[in-house]
């Protein structure tokens, strides 16, 4: 974890464009983020989170006019909600 001084410098430097996100997650999620970062040549778990939100947003946009994308999003949403206890921190 970054030192308090390093965090203060980061916040000062990026205060107008970024917000720090600290999230408690199960070990499984951390492993998944590391895998996503490795598989897509990203710069660590933070960028993997950003990529995951990018993919989700793109799929939501596709689902607005693509029935297959909507079907896949519905399946993923239902599967997550069914198994959310596995992923909950």
Placement of each model-derived feature along the sequence:
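Short Lys/Arg-rich basic patches
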Residues: 1-30, 34-37, 77-87
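Secondary-structure boundary motif
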Residues: 12, 38-42, 58
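Alpha-helix N-cap/helix-initiation sites
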Residues: 22, 26, 42-47
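Short, basic amphipathic alpha-helical segments that act as recognition/interaction helices
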Residues: 43-70
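Short, highly charged low-complexity linear segments
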Residues: 63-65, 86-89
